[in-house]
């Protein structure tokens, strides 16, 4: 039942991507290399890459497409997106027809001509782009062209072990990100060491992955609206300094990471039930994972992640359907993207999820589709009080931040910018560079990549 939206590792080959050939006219798949029209019926073979498609939310939507278009043979090369595999397929002139990729990579692939604009697909197939959440749609655009059809919408909130807080005499309201000095004191109070090493982390800032969220909380924008990197903004430097201080207060990076790596994040006996962690910010998919932990004594609590003015905020994550240059069945690919993300299909996915919920004798934790109307209607129809106040609060915190969440601006050098800040945070955590020096170097490298990048 666990529908997980996990980060995808960026293969090194992405950064070496060069411009790819244009759209091919030959159609070995028996379909159409054009993006179709509202009255065109796709046929032939649809080759998909990057889509695991194992759970009921995915399977119900695949079934919806196959039912609507029985003339299409769907071939899904199951597995997460692999950049090197994708680039090899594109450069060889034998790309898949549709690819499922993290939205933060769309700008890079669009700028370097590995994927094609979908404006004709959207127009000809009558895709209503107003149904998608604006922040998600923003991530798949470059220079006023749309290169992907978005789906899913991961946002963050603080999840908390009520047991850990009770043992330390800490109130749930003390897990807050508005007052950083108070958060540091709370983390220290919750932190437990044995033999000089962490035995319980008080508050995990989730570095390196959550650096963009901490920067946003401090008012920094890591990528400017035009796509130019802004990694060494003084507010970003301050955010990195603070979040690293939280780590250093709790054993230092080497000990902290070694201990954190022992967490059984997906197990019923995880870091919360084993009292290894008091609190951390994490995405909405994790609430569904924690359902199995209730029988192991989990006492879940939650607070929103806020900026320093006390307003709930979140970065967003999610995926997109893109059509590579040279796709042989772009018409079927377009209809696939439309069908998979439509209001009607999301309702079928929600029905499938509820069947699983009923079978598991569990409860609905939300479905965050990236389709605003679908989110609202599914929530109204299926979200009920769970009987567990902590889970109710967590679910509500995730829903409440949906309209406030912001994407990192798309960039023609999005992959390079992403790699640069991750390397910088790694250096700063390891102590091989100060946060400022690390981000200065990252900015220099990212800016050079941006200046060289084709702008779409």
Where are these regions (language model features)?
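Conserved N-terminal structural module of periplasmic/extracytoplasmic solute-binding proteins
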Residues: 2-108, 123-130, 309, 344-349, ...
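Extracytoplasmic ligand-binding clamshell segments of periplasmic binding protein
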Residues: 83, 220-293, 297-305, 438
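C-terminal lobe and pocket-closing loops
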Residues: 286-296, 310-315, 323-419
């Amino acid at each position: 039942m666990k529908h997980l939206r996990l980060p995808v590792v960026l293969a090194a080959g992405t950064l070496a991507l060069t411009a790819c050939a244009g759209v091919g006219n030959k159609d070995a798949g028996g379909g159409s290399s054009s993006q179709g029209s509202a009255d065109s019926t796709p046929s032939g073979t649809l080759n998909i890459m990057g889509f695991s498609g194992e759970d009921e939310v995915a399977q119900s939507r695949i079934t919806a497409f196959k039912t609507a278009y029985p003339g299409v043979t769907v071939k899904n090369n199951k597995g997460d997106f692999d950049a090197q595999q994708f680039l090899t397929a594109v450069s060889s002139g034998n790309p898949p027809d549709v690819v499922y990729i993290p939205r933060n990579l769309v700008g890079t692939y669009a700028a370097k001509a590995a994927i094609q604009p979908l404006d004709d697909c959207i127009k000809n197939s009558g895709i209503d782009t107003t149904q998608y959440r604006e922040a998600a749609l923003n991530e798949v655009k470059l220079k006023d062209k749309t290169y992907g059809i978005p789906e899913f919408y991961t946002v963050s909130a603080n999840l908390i072990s009520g047991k850990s807080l009770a043992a330390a005499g800490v109130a749930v309201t003390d897990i807050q990100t508005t007052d950083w000095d108070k958060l540091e004191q709370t983390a220290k109070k919750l932190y437990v060491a044995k033999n000089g090493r962490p035995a319980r982390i008080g508050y995990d800032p989730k570095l390196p992955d959550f650096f963009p969220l901490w920067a946003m909380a401090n008012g920094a924008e890591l990528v400017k609206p035009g796509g130019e990197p802004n990694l060494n903004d003084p507010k970003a430097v301050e955010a990195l300094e603070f979040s690293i201080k939280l780590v250093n207060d709790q054993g230092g990076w080497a000990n902290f990471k070694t201990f954190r790596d022992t967490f059984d994040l997906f197990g019923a006996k995880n870091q919360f039930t084993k009292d290894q962690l008091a609190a951390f910010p994490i995405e909405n998919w994790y609430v569904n994972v924690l359902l199995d932990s209730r029988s192991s004594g989990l006492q879940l609590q939650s607070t929103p992640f806020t900026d320093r003015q006390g307003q709930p905020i979140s970065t967003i994550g999610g995926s997109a359907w893109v059509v590579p240059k040279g796709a042989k069945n772009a018409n079927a690919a377009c209809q696939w993207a439309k069908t998979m993300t439509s209001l009607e299909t999301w309702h079928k996915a929600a029905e499938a999820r509820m069947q699983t919920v009923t079978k598991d004798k569990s409860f609905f934790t939300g479905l965050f589709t990236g389709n605003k109307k679908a989110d609202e209607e599914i929530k109204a129809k299926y979200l009920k009080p769970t009987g567990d106040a902590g889970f109710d609060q967590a679910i509500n915190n995730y829903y409440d931040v949906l309209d406030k969440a912001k994407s990192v601006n798309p960039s023609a050098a999005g992959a390079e910018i992403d790699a640069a800040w991750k390397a910088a945070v790694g250096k700063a955590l390891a102590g091989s560079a100060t946060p400022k020096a690390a981000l200065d170097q990252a900015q220099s490298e990212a800016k050079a990549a941006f200046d060289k990048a084709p702008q779409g």
